[in-house]
Structure formats: structure tokens, C-alpha cells
Amino acid sequence: MNVLITGAGGFMGAYLAQLAESAGHSVLGIDTKEPETGTYTGAFDLCDVRDAVRIYETIAAFRPQRIFHLAAQSYPTVSMTHPFDTMQTNAGGTINLFEGARAAGINPIVVVACSSAEYGMVAAEDLPVREEHALRPLHPYGVSKVAQDLLAYQYFANYGIPTVRIRIFNTTGPRKRDDVCSDFTKRAVQIELGIRRSPMIVGNLTTRRAIIDVRDMVRGLWIAADHATYGEVYNVGSSNIYSGAELVEAIRPLIKVPFTLEQDPALLRTCDEPVIAGDTTKFRLCSGWKPEIELSTTISDMVEWWRNHLAPAAALSNSWARADEHQVVA
């Protein structure tokens, strides 16, 4: 089976490609950047989902039976300063993908990676949030994902393209960058390796997130193509919720040196949802899927990945320190 993955050069896309390849499928990944060395082994093309001509050509040539649409501008803070680019990538790119399938005369199963950011501010009594909850996003990124979500639905409703929309909740794991788990594990390992000194700089430690391992998430995306009802939308994530403070305490015993904390006001978002957690009952019932990897395992794997990734920088930093010390002694 031919499987097309947009955003394959990114964190989740590379894991999904590995899963599809391990099942014996022919995978083509596309992205605007090359995958990180050692994270992706399948066929890959540099292709921007905003480029309609390239998307049409790619789909017509590869003729996928399944498409996993993960390509996105996925940072809320970036969307605040680049709202047009965010909308063009997330909504416009989705249109190009579906129109490319229509132009090629194919009818692939399309799994669209939507977002929990679509819900925005949710009252405490409505948590964990269900799929039918009102969508009130708090930033252009969330708005762009609502547009993507509803565009995918209308391509099912109007053209019969078998589409499944997955509202993804906080996902992390080894190789992740620029989320709270990644930032905290990276900074802690930097302190351990002597690259930076304590205190560890943090932002808001009171926000709470349901956090799932990326390996569980991509398994859910794959299962969705087989078991979900076309045209439907599903929450996929963890049912376990953690505050930033709890994440720090999960990391602390894994680090070989003590460290303190210091809050940086620059890291505090002006539009940050206090709690993000979804009710995944609908997806679990239709698919039999459930998360299998404990947060402790995820955090431990992330710490180990950062140790390996940062070791060359630590060695260089230590060699400079020894050279400076030698000059002082001399």
C-alpha cells in the first residue's frame, strides 16, 4: 500500500513513517525540510503543502491509498506574529492536498492531524473536553486548525473522500523540541553535563496538560485509518494530566546533579489554556486503542536522548574550560 505522509520531516511524521515502513508499506514523506539524520529511512521529497502544483504532481505520481496530513505551522506563539503564514499553511495546505487527490482521480483514506487548540478556553466542569464541545480557539494557530478540521469534513460531505479527523492532544517523546517536556529535559541535562548552570529556567508551572507519548499517538493515527468512521472527528491523547511542576519533579531524580528553578517572565504566554485534556472515549470504543507508555518511561527516554544529543557540545565546553584553566595556571 502506498502511504503519503505530509510533514514527514517533523517530529511526529518521522515516527509515523517508521511505523508504516515496519508494516511493509511503501512510504513517501514530504516536507519543507530534510528529516533529521537517523530519524527517517523512506522515500522523501522536499515539497511545501502551500505549493499546489507540486502537491498535485506528487499525488498524481505516487497515487497513495492512504494520506496522513501532518504538515503544519504548529506553534501558537509563532501564529501570533505570523497569522497569515499560519493560515496559508494549515488551511491552504489542506485545500491543496484534497484538491490534489480529486485532480488525480483517486479516493484515498485521509487522516488529518487536527488539534486540541481548537477548543480554546474550556470551563473546568467541561473537562475532559468532548468532541461536540464548542470551538473557541485563543490564537491564530487554533483558528487555522478549526479551518483545517472543517475543510476536511466538507471534502468528505461533498465529495465522499474517506476522511478521519484526529484532534491531537499534547504529544511528546524523544527528539521532540520546543514543548514543555522537551524544554525541561533539555535544560536539566544541560545542567548535568555542565553546558549551563543551575537554576533551570522555567515558565508557567501551574498549567496542566494531558501528555501522551508520540509512539502511542502515531499508533493511534494508524489505527484510525482502519477503524474510525469516515467523516467523524476524534480526540486522541492521554487521560493522565500533569502540571509543569509535576514534570519537573519527574525529571529531577533522573539528573545526576541537583538544580534549582527560576521563572522567566518572558516564557509566560498571554493566551495559555489553564488545562488541556480531552475525553478519548469515542476513539477508544471504535478502535480498541489505548496509550501503553507511562510518562516515567517517556521522560526517561527523553533524558537519555538529550544526553546523547548534547554530549558533543558538553565535550567541547569542557575542553574549553580546561584550556582556560591551563592558561590561568600558566
What are these regions (language model features)?
Residues T41-D51:
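Rossmann-fold cofactor-recognition segment
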Residues T81-N96, A103, I109, A117-R165, ...:
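Catalytic helix-loop patch of NAD(P)-dependent Rossmann-fold dehydrogenases
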Residues V122-P128, L150-R209, V214-R219, A225, ...:
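NAD(P)-dependent short-chain dehydrogenase/reductase
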Residues M217, L221, V236, L247, ...:
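Non-catalytic, hydrophobic alpha-helical segments
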